[in-house]
Design a protein with these regions (language model features):
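Active-site-adjacent structural elements in enzyme catalytic cores
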Residues: 1-191
Length: 191
């Protein structure tokens, strides 16, 4: 998140924003609950499950990470319960083999265009050249962490719907998928 994104979201609702420029790591911090015998990751971030496990031993993931917090349950960490990091357009994540994912995204884009919608596509560097579109953005390598900036760019393009490939949930990919799932309201198509 950049200072501009914060201003866009919170202008008039907060008194001040301190902007120290861009950061190297495009993800928020990892939040860990240490109140139980085994540490529980409430929000994955740049410090990965694997890094924590190597340092402290056994670590668990909060069950709500992939399903979201439901009903009247109080979230244990910021950003757990509601659609978060969400673009204006509806976001759908497509998961499966790279070939099937690319083919399904192409079908979904054609469907959207037939309805007169402008469809944005988020792809990894590995799949970026496999689809032709004026409205596609590259997330970088499938282990990169600039998905929030991509979602914001789609807002600037007045995109109606966004289709993103899913990413491996190993290492930093876990945090990326966590943010994408929140932004998509957990809407996934398996292919």
């Amino acid at each position: 998140t950049t200072a501009k994104h914060v201003i866009d979201d919170l202008n008039g609702r907060i008194d001040m924003i301190i902007d120290d420029g861009s950061i190297e790591i495009g993800l928020e911090s990892t939040i860990v609950d240490l109140t139980e015998d085994v540490p529980v990751i409430l929000r994955p971030g740049y410090v990965t499950f694997e890094m924590l496990e190597e340092t402290v031993g056994e670590v668990r993931l909060d069950k709500a990470l992939m399903t979201g917090v439901k009903g009247n349950v109080k979230p244990k960490a910021p950003g757990m319960k509601y659609r978060h990091y969400a673009p204006k357009a509806e976001l759908t994540i497509i998961e499966g083999s790279p070939e099937k994912t690319v083919a399904r995204i192409e079908e979904l884009v054609k469907e959207a265009e037939r309805k007169g919608q402008k469809a944005g596509i988020m792809l990894s560097e590995e799949n970026f050249d496999k689809i032709c579109s004026d409205y596609k953005l590259c997330l970088g390598s499938s282990s990169d962490e600039n998905e929030i900036a991509c979602l914001r760019k789609f807002d600037d393009m007045d995109i109606d719907v966004i289709f993103s490939e899913g990413f491996s949930e190993e290492g930093i990919g876990q945090a990326i998928m966590n943010r994408l799932l929140k932004a998509a309201g957990h809407k996934i198509i398996e292919v």
